């Protein structure tokens, strides 16, 4: 039974087949399952682990037991080096090949794996789990074999070198009185299922933290409560009638869409008396990595701080784990469903492979949650983008390859919920005109999927989606032949007393970018209601204005489009793309140089969508220029570092692709709606100096690249500082 086909790991075998196999044959099987090119050091580590374990596991060679290499914990994005399923016990092995000493961070890593299995892995809930750290050159071994004080059947982490691992396993089996041979059936394809314990902790964590602090807190509670109540009613009707339904929630930036999504995720999971409902759970999913990272870290830090103040012995990693019940990155949800399909796809139809998934009575082959909330659903990928991505196995070729994927991401997400055999509801949170990256499909792709593939789904949508930002204003037209559509104004987060600034700012931004004649009037309206918008041509003045505006712990930051190129002369650097960087940029205070408040690193639309600061500087580069009543779009063509050609110098060139032009326009739409309290727009003067020979000193920053845009803003009466 060596290496039965699965997408959950790189290698799986019974002990006997593994021990009798040639080590290089096992390594070859791991290579075959690995997507991408393994590093030499990774190869060497795998080979040493294989050779060690063939000897170490020999006492149990003839038992019914399994070994698994590189196991992916469903939907958590974590991978365990080696799992042993022996006598009903789960051993989590974390190897540090060539390492002599045990590090605290490594101990915490292997313990986290054990906790993740206990809390989220259905077939591990009621099992003994033993985390073992193995720095291979370590010369001593743990001598205490006890379950943790939390009475959860998890052993305290054990530490041993390679030479002591066999004895450690023997001692664990003796202490656990594990005398009967046996593995755990279907453990490798266990469904993702959070325990009631982790869900209750997550609920407490969420309810004791004001999410408005980190999402969009111009939202009006009356307005959002009406929308939340409507969605919960749709969910309840779907449950009672055994139907599949989808709700589209729309609204201006700052109207509270993310807040609505998180509230629905929590409230749907509990009955009116506050008890957890295992069958009615919901999950909030977003493809926005920085948003998920910042939300998760903010909630976790707050919970950790409050727990410590109460004298509780709690780790920050525990709080993060609790948050992950309700808030997850959408790609892991998607990948978990992809792991269940027959591959390659035949005749353009997705099918579940019963060898790769467990069918449950209620959820069928779907995920455990009846309700999935997709934030920023307009950013779901087109068929072309996701098909290309899966064909090459991800960005770097290191993920599951599906060579002929037949549908868009929106269609696949609906298909995933459609696998449930009872009922399901999808909630799509839609930002109009906020598709900002190549291959982001917008609301029209969701509607197309419903019309063409899922006509049996009920569709609930606002009747106000006539603006150009929503499927070019064609929402009603696209749905006119769908017989299952219900229109309701309760699904659009619109004007309210507390969100007037967000609503007015959104109207001004729409007119500004569309050259509507009321833009100047709307600007005055925004400013007169306490939201300052000022203009400058100097980054120093912009920084000074931000520092003067911010009081107490109010946050400032510089924002820039990802296509921008000529910002270094202004002493601005772009924040490197990583979720950790986004967390530090948003959450650290004014004493930390990684904080946005230092006004040194600028975040792009990719990093700030769905989040905001109090006061922002939007640095407007030459990538989008005003020209006689229209926008022109430019991309920066850099020189080839290794093969320079004559006349091949860095320069701006026109962006002619209409799709890319739309993304560039939407990028600025996102950037100038990120500030809660006010913003300064900096349009540089450029460089008008010439060389002694009369040539421009910097031909990439000519004043003409900026002056017309500056003139347009001035014509609207925007106050200059």
Predicted features along the sequence, with ranges:
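Accessory nucleic-acid engagement/destabilization modules that flank
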Residues: 1-194
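N-terminal pre-P-loop "Q-motif" helix
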Residues: 213-245
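Conserved RecA-like ASCE ATPase "motif II neighborhood" in helicase/translocase motors
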Residues: 317-417, 600-604, 667
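Hydrophobic anchor at the beta1->P-loop junction of P-loop NTPases
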Residues: 249
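Conserved helicase/translocase motor-coupling segment
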Residues: 261, 436-442, 451, 457-628
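C-terminal accessory regions
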Residues: 422-425, 598-721
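Conserved lysine of the Walker
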Residues: 257
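Signature of the SF2 helicase/ATPase Hel1-core->accessory helical subdomain module
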Residues: 373-477
